[in-house]
Amino acid sequence: MSEFTLKTRLLAALEGKPVDKVPVCSVTQTGIVELMDEVGAAWPEAHTNPELMAKLAIANYELSGLEAVRLPYCLTVLGEAMGCEINMGTKNRQPSVTASPYPKNLDGAAVPADLLQRNRIPAVLEAIKIVREKVGPDVPIIGGMEGPVTLASDLISVKSFMKWSIKKTDLFEQALDISTEAAIAYANAMVEAGADVIAIADPVASPDLMSPDTFRQFLQSRLQKFSASVNSVTVLHICGKVNAILSDMADCGFEGLSVEEKIGDAAEGKKVIGDRARLVGNISSPFTLLPGPIDKIKAEAKVALEGGIDVLAPGCGIAPMTPLENIKALVAARDEYYA
């Protein structure tokens, strides 16, 4: 009988403390169509209805065996509350930002006093409370959200974000500061509602989009402020081949760094970050978990576990068309590793 609960194991693993086995969960989006059909909680309704949001999130814990409940399912909740226009997507396509409120300048841009009452934020907070009531105290809840860098680019548009980072650095920094403040407020509201871990996805901070120099000069300090100000264990997910900034990510103060398969194998990543942070991932969502087959999923999971991954997880958001049996295979791979 293990002395760990799912929650204490995950938190210990993220804090770099000894565990009996590596936890397996997802710190990125978990909504899949098969489960939407199975439990009757589908997108896009599950993005706005707290009962459906909770039901779909719990399904991937109860039916696949993932060892945490992670919600919501997109990176637009905070952006919408800050004035972005959103396309709510379809049953198998996530919501996305379609228009930014401040593409020309930041006149009138600020964190609204009623931020936490706006748009879908109350639904997410309510869903977290429902999940806690349903799964009890020993199952970890992971609150997901867009990171401050991605939020800033949503507020001013990707085009202005790129341009201002070079030509209008004062405006660029102002946008980052506003978005960092908003992100901290929302993250702490999720913690207060019952989230044990806050996982931010900050794809715009990736070297695929922003240079490592820009990361070090402007982005890193905002991520440090975020992790220092949020009252929980935190995980930073940045998409893509992040090798050029992985060491800088490890200095951002997050307990966990979530990475894709694009960084190479887990052992390499572990070498770079040392004991500054724990590595989460890095089983390919689009190229392994989505298409399978199961033996490939298990083989890649074994490589990650042998490489010293601290939390076994999909390398990015789970693709909505991923079969449930493929997610179960990820869990089985971890179990077999310790058998």
Swiss-Prot record:
Asked if the record carries the keyword Protein biosynthesis, the reply is no
Q: What InterPro entries does the entry give?
A: Methanogen_methyltrans, Mtase_MtaA_CmuA, UROD/MetE-like_sf, Uroporphyrinogen_deCOase
Q: GO: which molecular function terms?
A: [methyl-Co(III) methanol-specific corrinoid protein]:coenzyme M methyltransferase; metal ion binding; uroporphyrinogen decarboxylase activity
Catalytically driven reaction(s): methyl-Co(III)-[methanol-specific corrinoid protein] + coenzyme M = Co(I)-[methanol-specific corrinoid protein] + methyl-coenzyme M + H(+)
Q: Which UniProt keywords apply?
A: Metal-binding, Methanogenesis, Methyltransferase, Transferase, Zinc
Domain of life assignment: Archaea
Judged by the first EC level, this protein's enzyme class is: transferase
Residues that, per the record, bind Zn(2+): H237, C239, C316
Q: Does the keyword Cell membrane apply?
A: no
CDD domains according to UniProt: Mta_CmuA_like (cd03307)
Tell me its family. Answer: Belongs to the uroporphyrinogen decarboxylase family. MtbA/mtaA subfamily.
| PANTHER family to which the protein is assigned, alphabetical | METHYLCOBAMIDE:COM METHYLTRANSFERASE MTBA
What's this chain's function? Methyltransferase involved in methanogenesis in the methanol pathway. Catalyzes the transfer of the methyl group from the methylated corrinoid protein MtaC to coenzyme M, forming the substrate for coenzyme-B sulfoethylthiotransferase. MtaC can be substituted by free cob(I)alamin in vitro.
Q: What is this protein called?
A: Methylcobamide:CoM methyltransferase MtaA
Q: Which organism was this protein described from?
A: Methanosarcina barkeri
Which gene name belongs to this protein?
A: mtaA
